[in-house]
């Protein structure tokens, strides 16, 4: 295959690879539960396997009708609530009905560039409800608790809200501890059995969300549609698994229960943000399910048998906030994996680490992208220089190649043989021009996921009209400049021998301009910067080579 054929294939492969394959892999290839579900059994409630003696890894149940009533969002409408504000949270509302957290806004993250209102990660807004709750279950039946507010006290700089309530012979004291600078909330409860008989109690920490999976569709020209929305969890056997809401909606209401076999966690994931329950016990079980229609629930429940006049302490940590590795790594094992950069995460993490350090110095993510690009080009300069010298030599051979083409225009086999002899004689590798492009593929894909998944770049401005590097260029200036740079780069490269190939190559900048028009502007900025540096390097090396090899 000719060198120009290879170049064309590589260019097209880049687009197809990260758009059609990498871009969609999270939605197309969700976690496969086949291996675990070999031990699945059918039951009438996801609490049926709550005993600590149960060893089932995964249990699917068929209790849709009985579970649908567990989350009735409207029941919180008329209940009183306590509002708490911290350095990172605005208007955290804790309902006195069951102690559910029905609203929490993030002070440092606005809804959009145009709407600076803090975004509500948890919300009781009708039609888009998303709440965190801790349900008391007695003898495998959820009970409702009307709590009383015992006030908020400040201790070591932390706000501690205490609620007390009683139901079905249980006295419950629940505390919520808020750290002023953190997104994690400690939820602890003391449950006392005031009856004359032992009571089997379960504390079910869960999320419930009204979400339409049909609206979470993939679009080739919308980069943000590649992101994941659904459930994630971690156990001793599975360090990190995900299940999209779209896939869960196809389970016909059958909850899936997983034995954590140690400290695990369960979370609702969305673009840039995560809400996670982290039980502090080692015998918790994790579950997720589609309650009915567009309502999804996931949680972790811990069981205990409380003797008469005895009490049990059960604690959990609730995290609801941005997906920032530094915030998550110490909360629970593998929680930082919710920052999922895909198959090339190793390279992505290195790129982000370097970018983050540069950003701390220059204070602008756009400049950080440019400087990272310069650094990458510097590291790979020896390979690029070798490739450009080979291309310069190929360019100088063009007159001889054209003479061969004219001489053997009716004998393509002989032409191919003579050209290979020429390459061998002049010690030229016609494929070496592809090397810089091959090097760019993993870097390009890695940076793509960094720009798409890193919340630090959400609404990050660059200059002038670029107000958000994670979104497309609103005026398409960068994609057009990138297309022009590709066209200029082609002019510096050896011309294709085949006229048809030359026409195809001429249209590639147009095709890529169209594709890049929908990509995050930060990614286009990287590609444009990379092209401009490559053009400069190639021009200098070509001029120098031609000056020193004139005959």
Swiss-Prot record:
A Pfam family that the UniProt record links to this protein: 60KD_IMP
Domain of life: Bacteria
Feature: compositional bias, Low complexity: 50-59
GO cellular component annotations of the record: plasma membrane
Keyword Ion transport (UniProt): no
Membrane topology qualifier: Multi-pass membrane protein
Any one GO MF annotation of this record: membrane insertase activity
Sequence intervals crossing the membrane: 3-23, 361-381, 431-451, 504-524
Annotated segments matching region Disordered: 33-59
Task of the protein: Required for the insertion and/or proper folding and/or complex formation of integral membrane proteins into the membrane. Involved in integration of membrane proteins that insert both dependently and independently of the Sec translocase complex, as well as at least some lipoproteins. Aids folding of multispanning membrane proteins.
UniProt similarity note: Belongs to the OXA1/ALB3/YidC family. Type 1 subfamily.
UniProt subunit comment: Interacts with the Sec translocase complex via SecD. Specifically interacts with transmembrane segments of nascent integral membrane proteins during membrane integration.
Record's protein name: Membrane protein insertase YidC
Organism of provenance: Francisella tularensis subsp. tularensis (strain SCHU S4 / Schu 4)
